[in-house]
From Swiss-Prot:
Cofactor stoichiometry and binding remark: Manganese or magnesium. Binds 1 divalent metal ion per monomer in the absence of substrate. May bind a second metal ion after substrate binding.
Protein name: Ribonuclease HII
Protein role: Endonuclease that specifically degrades the RNA of RNA-DNA hybrids.
Cofactors required: Mn(2+); Mg(2+)
Keyword terms, alphabetized: Cytoplasm, Endonuclease, Hydrolase, Manganese, Metal-binding, Nuclease
A single MF term (Gene Ontology): manganese ion binding
Catalyzed reactions per annotation: Endonucleolytic cleavage to 5'-phosphomonoester
Localisation per UniProt entry: Cytoplasm
Keyword Cytoplasm: yes
EC number: 3.1.26.4
Residue intervals of the RNase H type-2 domain: 61-286
Keyword Nuclease applies: yes
Amino acid sequence: MNSMLHIESNLLQIERSIEQIDIKGQYINLASPIYLSGQLNINELLAQYSNNIAQSDTSSVLQIGVDEAGRGPLLGSVNVASAILPRAWSGLIEGQPLKDTPLSILTDSKQLSEKKRDMLYPLVQQHAIGYVIADIPAAVIDQVNILQATMLGMRLCTEVMLEVIAYHLNDMAQDVHQLHAEVLFDGNRCPELNYARLVELGVEEKVDCQAWIKGDARHTSIAAASILAKVSRDKTMYALDAQHPEYGIAKHKGYPTRAHMEAIETYGVLAAHRRSFAPVRKALKR
């Protein structure tokens, strides 16, 4: 795993390239690197951590929302994001914790127009205490299947977030054992985290993983992650569209529309197509 951390002012910039992954004690060479990027606001982390401990005298609770975008398309990556909002902003959407904040319109990204998602994307990045975005390429999806690729992305976004938080709390002479992380995953299951890594970080007993069905429409932290995942994936689709305008990728975003299937039939299968998906397999056999 290639890791890069840049500190600009109080913002820690996160960049990771993962070529090999430990799954249940076995290292697997990935068919293509998984790229992660993100940011941690160190001052805001310390302020919230200290404030939470002062109020409870026991622990500091951070809520990490995690969501994905792009499981259904035939083309390109599946993107996953984790996000930590300020504690007062993190909660059930119906409770309106974002009222009168810059993120007041935030909800499930699928319920928002592309214009509103694009508007929220930099605002989430600006106001989040921390976030991580993972890009899991088609080659890895084909290697492990789309469900496992998504779970892997969720796991990595969570572990990288916890790692940089634990590292900087220790660096600032804070007791990391007082950290309690509630990790809220959109969907009906949680990924299996690398327990050995959590032990190394000293947080193995303080990570509470929760599966939230339709969580992106229920919890602000998951909705924030949903925006990051969706817009980051759209950006990769627009980049592919610029390289292959004849496929109309900007319109269908890789989903199996009639126009997309006709483009595959006319121009063939691209390197970024998911060969493990039935329509692409069928096209390759022609």
